[in-house]
Design a protein with these regions (language model features):
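Bacterial N-terminal signal peptides that target proteins for export
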Residues: 1-8
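Generic anion/oxyanion-binding catalytic loop in active/binding sites
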Residues: 9, 21
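N-terminal signal peptide c-region/cleavage motif recognized by signal peptidases
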Residues: 15-17
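Non-catalytic accessory/assembly modules
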Residues: 22-168
Length: 168
């Protein structure tokens, strides 16, 4: 009996730190993946045309909001994501999660640093802008049901407002 208690005590004492480290690592990895998912869903929602081109049809009835308020929300989101990724303890991550962490952190640093250059004042150039993207969007838009057509009509109807936002 004493031998069993001694063995159990030894197992618990050695397993506790290992288990705590595994749980901590899993917690950091879980937080990291949740942050990635939250950011990705935000991007798809903020840029519905991109979502459509990627095959995500949840936002096919919308266009990107270029209002001053929306632009400020996107800037705040980038700052928030940078702050939140830095709160995840990188040393608790392993393997691919470390690489993903580093890439995401670098991306968010570049995005926040780039906010110094207000690209919203030049939304159209010879390579990019609604004058090009809107016409190309139809090639990625599904037209399999009446709902698909209704979504596209809603998008067409929103186009003048989007142009007004870009002019403002």
């Amino acid at each position: 009996m004493t031998r069993n208690v001694t063995l159990l005590t030894f197992v618990l004492l050695t397993a506790s730190p290992i288990l705590a480290q595994v749980l901590s690592s899993t917690d950091a990895a879980t937080k990291l993946r949740a942050l990635f998912d939250e950011d990705w869903q935000w991007v798809l929602q903020q840029y519905p045309e991109a979502a459509t081109m990627l095959g995500d049809n949840r936002f096919n009835d919308r266009l990107t909001d270029y209002s001053t308020e929306a632009i400020e929300r996107r800037k705040a989101h980038e700052r928030d994501m940078l702050d939140r990724i830095q709160k995840i303890n990188r040393s608790e991550l392993k393997g691919q999660d470390v690489i993903s962490y580093d890439l995401f952190l670098q991306d968010k640093k570049l995005n926040v640093d780039g906010l110094r250059f207000p690209t919203e004042y030049m939304p159209i150039d010879q390579m990019n802008g609604v004058q090009i993207g809107f016409g190309q969007l139809v090639g990625s838009t599904p037209f399999r049901s009446a709902k698909d057509y209704d979504a596209y009509i809603a998008r067409l109807s929103a186009f003048p407002a989007q142009i007004d936002q870009l002019i403002a």
